[in-house]
Swiss-Prot record:
One of its GO terms (biological process) is translation. The keyword tRNA-binding applies. This is Small ribosomal subunit protein uS12. The modification 3-methylthioaspartic acid is found at residue 89. The gene is rpsL. It comes from Geotalea daltonii (strain DSM 22248 / JCM 15807 / FRC-32). Belongs to the universal ribosomal protein uS12 family.
Length: 123
């Protein structure tokens, strides 16, 4: 325990908060190129084949990001936009691909929550 005098002289060091999406480097989104598109299984107790992509960002960092929605057109060398946001049951996946921008098309026949999946308004 420091004395009152030591606290007056030096003071306490304030805690720095850690970023949940460090690869974005304080940007809201970043562009990148898919290096690998594959499926992976979630941790217990869930069971599925989750679609994920390994993305090399414009700042040189390579991250694993989740492809949301039903069906996608992504393959190797596709240019995508990623945003922060982790997937709770996939360890190491801390980013989401933004649907409906760059090479990623929006989800087809989506009626609700369209803006989140890049779907146009149905006629």
């Amino acid at each position: 325990m420091p004395t009152i005098n030591q606290l007056i002289r030096i003071g306490r060091e304030s805690k720095k908060d850690k970023s949940t999406a460090p690869a974005l480097k304080c940007c809201p989104q970043k562009r990148g190129v898919c290096t690998r598109v594959y499926t992976t299984t979630p941790k217990k107790p869930n069971s599925a084949l989750r679609k994920v992509a390994r993305v090399r960002l414009t700042n040189g960092i390579e991250v694993t990001s989740y492809i949301p929605g039903v069906g996608h057109n992504l393959q190797e060398h596709s240019v995508v936009l990623i945003r922060g946001g982790r997937v709770k049951d996939l360890p190491g996946v801390r980013y989401h691909i933004v649907r409906g921008t760059l090479d990623s098309v929006g989800v087809k026949d989506r009626k609700k929550s369209r803006s989140k999946y890049g779907a146009k308004r149905p006629k």
